[in-house]
C-alpha cells in the first residue's frame, strides 16, 4: 500500500521551517546556504500552497512580510522600558574618566578588586535607525522607532518586510523586546540611488537617510523594495523564560542573591543568546577589553577598518560586560552609567559652497571642484571637495551659494554629497561648464557617451604636463625619488621642462638654484634621474601616461612585445593578442603612438640615454594566470613586496575580489574584501600560506 504524502499543513510547516533556516543562514550568519533561484522556488511553492489553503495562512509565515494596506499615519507606541541614548566621548580624556568612574563605583560596591580592571564588551556604533522589536509567545507583535526615548512610532508593517527580521523565534521567552539598528549597506545604497535617479525620483543623501526614509514609508510595499538590514544589539522587556531553563541568580553586592529574568549574566552572553534565537547580531568585530587602554586600542583598531566595512559606523560603544555590575552602576538622567559611545570625527558636515572651479588632470579630464567655507570633517579641516563631473552636479542639483553636506571617509577625497534644499538662498547660481581650458585656453570637449569633459591641449597644456610628469616620476613608473609636485611646478612654470625627456637633461647646478633645493638635494635628484635611465620596459610604458593603460597592462604588453619599437609599431590586431587587452586598451595604445608628438618624445628619451630593459619573464609558472587580491597588513612583507613576488611567479594582482579571484591574501585588519571572498568561496591565505604557494 502506497504511503500517503504529507498533508497540506505538514507541507506548509516544512516549507516555512526550511525558508526560515535559509533566512537565518543568510541574514544572521552571513552564510547563504542555497542559490537565490532555489530560495525563490521554495517561496513560490509556499505561496501556491497557502493560496490553495488560505485557512492555513498565519501572520508569521514568510509570505506575509508584505501585504498590509498603506497607512494614513503612524500610530504611537509607549516603550515599556525607555530607549535611552548613550553618553558620548570624543577624546582619550573622556574615555579614561569614564573608566575611572566605573571602576571606582564597582570597587565601592565590592565587585572589583583594587588590582583588577573593568571588563567591557566593545561593539561597533552602527549609523542607522534605532528600532525596538517586541515578540510575544515567539511571534513578532510590534515594532517601533526610538522616538523621544519614551514614545516612538509604530512601524510594524514596514519592519515585517525586512527579510533579516525573524517573524517567529523558537525557544523565546513569553515576552522579549529586542533593540537594534536598521541600516543599509553602502553598495546597496548606491544601487538604490542609481535606480531612483533612473526613475527620475529623489536620491538619498547617505545610507542612514535612505534607511530612515525607507522605514517611514506609509506604504509597506515600498519599504519591501528597499535593501534594509537589521542588527540586534540590546534588549528591553524580558518576561517568562521558557520552561526547563534554570533560574539564574545575580549577586549585585557581596552576599546578596537576586533571581534574574535573563538567561545569561554578561552583555556579550546575551547577544550570543539572541543570535541563538535566530536574530541577526553583528558579532564579527565585537570584542572584550579591559581598562581604558584596552578601550582605546579597540577604538584605534576599528578606526583603521572603518572605510572597509560594508556599512557606515560613527563610532564604537563600550558597555560593562557583567550584568550585575550594570545594575549597580544604574542610570543618570537619560543615559546608562555603564555604557559610553566613543564617536569618530564626523564624516559628514554642513558648510557653504562658495564657488566651483575646474581642475585639469593628466589626461585632460576636467573635474569640477567645490570651494567651501572651512569645515572640520573626518578629522581634518576641508576647504575643497570634488564634484566629480557636470552630470553629477546636475543630478545632485548643487548650486553656488548652497548650504551643502560634505563627506570625508578615511583617506577618501572629500566630496559634496548634496544640498540642504531648505536653506537654499534666492540668489543660488547653477554651474556652467567652461568651453575653454582655464590653463591653456584650448577647447574643452566632451566625447560622446562619456561623463568626463576634457581639455584638448595635450602636453601644450601646462596642467596636463605637470600631472603627466608627476605620474611618470611616481613609484610605480620611473620611481625618481625627490621629483615631487612642488619641484615639477617650478620646472614647468619656468618653461624648463616641456616633456618627459627634458627631465633627463637637468643638471645639479640649475636644480640647486630652485626654491627649497640645496646643493646636496640637487645632486641626489640628478643621481635618482640617472638611475631611471634603464627602467623596465613596462615601467616606461606606464610612465608615458597612455589612457586606460595601468601598471599591470603596461607590464603585460611589454612582456608580449619585448621592445618599445615593436609596441609603437603594433597594429590594433597585434595588441589584442596580448592577454587581458581588449578593444578599448588596444585602441588607446594605437592612437597614442599614431600621434607624431608622442613618438617624438620616445625618440627624445632615447637621445637622453634612456634605454628600457626587456621585462623579465616570470621565474616560474606555478601561478601563471592566477589573480590575487591583497588586504590588510602582513607581518613581514609589504604589499609592494608581495605584489612583486606574485608577478615574478606569473600571477596577477587585482584591487577587488570577484569570481575570477584565485586567492585572497590577508594580513591584520582585513576588511570587507575578506567578507566578499568568503561569500564567493575564494581561498584565503595568510603571509605564510602565500610563501608556501610561492615555494619560499
Swiss-Prot record:
Q: Which CDD domains match?
A: BRCT_DNA_ligase_like (cd17748), LIGANc (cd00114)
Write down the InterPro entries for this protein, in alphabetical order: BRCT_dom, BRCT_dom_sf, DisA/LigA_HHH, DNA_ligase, DNA_ligase_AS, DNA_ligase_CS, DNAligase_adenylation, DNAligase_N
UniProt-annotated catalytic positions: 125
- Which reaction equation describes what this protein catalyses? NAD(+) + (deoxyribonucleotide)n-3'-hydroxyl + 5'-phospho-(deoxyribonucleotide)m = (deoxyribonucleotide)n+m + AMP + beta-nicotinamide D-nucleotide
Question: Which cofactor names does the annotation list?
Answer: Mg(2+); Mn(2+)
- Residues bound to NAD(+) are 36-40, 85-86, 123, 146, 181, 319, 343
What GO molecular function annotations does the UniProt record carry, in alphabetical order?
A: DNA binding; DNA ligase (NAD+) activity; metal ion binding
Q: Which SUPFAM superfamilies match?
A: BRCT domain, DNA ligase/mRNA capping enzyme, catalytic domain, Nucleic acid-binding proteins, RuvA domain 2-like
GO annotation terms (biological process)? DNA repair; DNA replication
* Superkingdom field: Bacteria
Q: Pfam families from the entry?
A: BRCT, DNA_ligase_aden, DNA_ligase_OB, DNA_ligase_ZBD, HHH_2, HHH_5, Nlig-Ia
Looking at the record, the residues that make up the BRCT domain are: 618-696
Residues bound to Zn(2+)? 437, 440, 455, 461
EC assignment: the record states 6.5.1.2
Keyword annotations from UniProtKB, A to Z: DNA damage, DNA repair, DNA replication, Ligase, Magnesium, Manganese, Metal-binding, NAD, Zinc
Q: Name one GO cellular component term.
A: cytosol
> What does this protein's UniProt record list under function?
DNA ligase that catalyzes the formation of phosphodiester linkages between 5'-phosphoryl and 3'-hydroxyl groups in double-stranded DNA using NAD as a coenzyme and as the energy source for the reaction. It is essential for DNA replication and repair of damaged DNA.
Concerning NCBIfam families, the annotation shows: dnlj, PRK07956.1
Of which family is this protein a member? Answer: Belongs to the NAD-dependent DNA ligase family. LigA subfamily.
Q: What is this protein called?
A: DNA ligase
Q: What is the species of this protein? A: Bordetella parapertussis (strain 12822 / ATCC BAA-587 / NCTC 13253)
Which gene name does the record give? Answer: ligA
Amino acid at each position: 500500500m502506497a504511503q500517503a504524502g504529507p498533508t497540506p499543513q505538514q507541507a506548509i510547516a516544512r516549507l516555512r521551517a526550511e525558508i526560515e533556516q535559509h533566512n537565518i543562514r543568510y541574514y544572521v550568519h552571513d552564510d547563504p546556504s542555497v542559490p537565490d533561484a532555489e530560495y525563490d522556488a521554495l517561496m513560490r511553492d509556499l505561496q501556491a500552497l497557502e493560496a490553495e489553503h488560505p485557512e492555513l495562512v498565519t501572520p508569521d509565515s514568510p509570505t506575509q512580510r508584505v501585504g498590509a494596506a498603506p497607512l494614513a499615519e503612524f500610530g504611537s507606541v509607549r516603550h515599556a522600558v525607555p530607549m535611552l541614548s548613550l553618553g558620548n566621548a570624543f577624546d582619550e580624556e573622556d574615555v579614561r574618566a569614564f573608566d575611572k568612574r566605573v571602576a571606582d563605583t564597582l570597587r565601592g560596591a565590592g565587585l572589583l578588586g583594587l588590582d583588577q580592571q573593568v571588563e567591557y564588551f566593545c561593539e561597533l556604533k552602527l549609523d542607522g535607525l534605532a528600532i525596538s522589536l517586541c515578540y510575544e509567545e515567539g511571534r513578532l507583535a510590534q515594532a517601533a522607532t526610538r522616538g523621544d526615548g519614551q514614545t516612538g512610532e509604530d512601524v510594524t508593517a514596514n519592519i515585517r518586510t525586512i527579510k533579516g527580521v525573524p517573524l517567529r523565534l523558537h525557544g523565546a521567552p513569553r515576552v522579549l523586546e529586542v533593540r537594534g539598528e536598521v541600516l543599509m549597506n553602502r553598495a546597496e545604497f548606491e544601487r538604490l540611488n542609481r535606480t531612483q535617479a533612473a526613475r527620475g525620483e529623489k536620491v538619498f543623501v547617505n545610507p542612514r537617510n535612505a534607511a530612515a526614509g525607507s522605514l517611514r514609508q506609509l506604504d509597506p510595499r515600498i519599504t519591501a523594495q528597499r535593501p534594509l538590514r537589521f542588527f540586534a544589539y540590546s534588549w528591553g522587556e524580558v518576561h517568562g523564560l521558557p520552561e526547563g531553563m534554570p533560574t539564574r541568580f545575580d549577586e549585585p553586592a557581596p552576599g546578596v542573591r537576586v533571581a534574574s529574568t535573563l538567561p545569561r549574566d554578561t552583555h556579550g552572553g546575551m547577544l550570543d543568546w539572541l543570535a541563538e534565537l535566530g536574530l541577526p547580531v553583528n558579532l564579527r568585530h565585537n570584542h572584550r577589553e579591559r581598562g581604558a587602554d584596552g578601550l582605546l586600542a579597540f577604538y584605534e583598531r576599528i578606526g583603521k577598518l572603518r572605510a572597509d566595512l560594508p556599512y557606515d559606523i560613527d563610532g564604537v560603544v563600550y558597555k560593562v560586560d557583567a550584568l550585575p555590575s550594570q545594575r549597580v552602576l544604574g542610570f543618570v538622567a537619560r543615559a546608562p552609567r555603564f555604557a559610553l559611545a566613543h564617536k569618530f570625527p564626523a564624516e559628514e558636515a554642513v558648510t557653504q559652497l562658495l564657488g566651483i572651479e575646474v581642475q585639469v588632470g593628466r589626461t585632460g579630464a576636467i573635474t569640477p571642484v567645490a570651494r567651501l567655507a572651512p569645515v572640520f570633517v573626518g578629522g581634518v579641516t576641508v576647504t575643497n571637495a570634488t564634484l566629480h563631473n557636470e552630470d553629477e552636479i546636475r543630478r545632485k542639483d548643487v548650486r553656488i551659494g548652497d548650504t551643502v553636506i560634505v563627506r570625508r571617509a578615511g583617506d577618501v577625497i572629500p566630496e559634496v554629497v548634496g544640498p540642504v534644499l531648505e536653506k537654499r538662498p534666492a540668489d543660488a547660481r547653477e554651474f556652467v561648464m567652461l568651453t575653454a581650458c582655464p590653463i591653456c585656453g584650448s577647447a574643452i570637449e566632451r566625447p560622446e557617451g562619456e561623463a568626463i569633459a576634457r581639455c584638448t591641449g595635450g602636453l601644450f597644456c601646462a596642467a596636463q604636463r605637470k600631472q603627466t610628469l608627476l605620474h611618470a616620476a611616481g613609484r610605480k613608473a620611473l620611481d625618481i625619488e625627490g621629483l615631487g609636485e612642488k619641484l615639477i611646478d617650478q620646472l614647468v612654470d619656468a618653461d624648463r621642462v616641456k616633456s618627459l625627456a627634458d627631465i633627463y637633461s637637468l643638471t645639479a647646478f640649475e636644480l640647486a638654484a630652485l626654491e627649497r633645493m640645496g646643493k646636496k638635494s640637487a645632486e641626489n635628484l640628478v643621481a635618482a634621474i640617472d638611475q631611471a635611465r634603464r627602467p623596465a620596459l613596462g615601467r616606461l610604458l606606464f610612465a608615458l601616461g597612455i589612457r586606460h593603460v595601468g601598471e599591470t597592462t603596461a607590464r603585460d604588453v611589454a612582456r608580449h612585445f619585448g621592445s618599445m619599437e615593436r609596441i609603437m609599431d603594433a597594429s590594433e590586431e597585434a595588441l589584442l593578442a596580448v592577454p587581458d587587452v581588449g578593444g578599448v586598451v588596444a585602441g588607446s595604445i594605437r592612437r597614442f603612438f599614431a600621434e607624431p608628438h608622442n613618438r617624438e618624445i620616445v625618440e627624445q628619451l632615447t637621445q637622453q640615454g634612456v634605454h628600457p630593459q626587456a621585462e623579465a619573464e616570470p621565474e616560474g609558472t606555478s601561478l601563471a594566470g592566477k589573480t590575487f587580491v591583497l588586504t590588510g597588513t602582513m607581518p613581514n612583507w609589504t604589499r609592494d613586496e608581495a605584489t612583486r613576488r606574485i608577478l615574478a611567479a606569473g600571477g596577477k594582482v587585482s584591487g577587488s575580489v570577484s569570481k575570477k579571484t584565485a586567492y585572497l591574501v590577508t594580513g591584520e585588519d582585513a576588511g570587507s574584501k575578506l567578507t566578499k571572498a568568503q561569500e564567493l568561496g575564494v581561498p584565503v591565505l595568510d603571509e605564510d600560506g602565500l610563501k608556501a604557494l610561492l615555494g619560499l
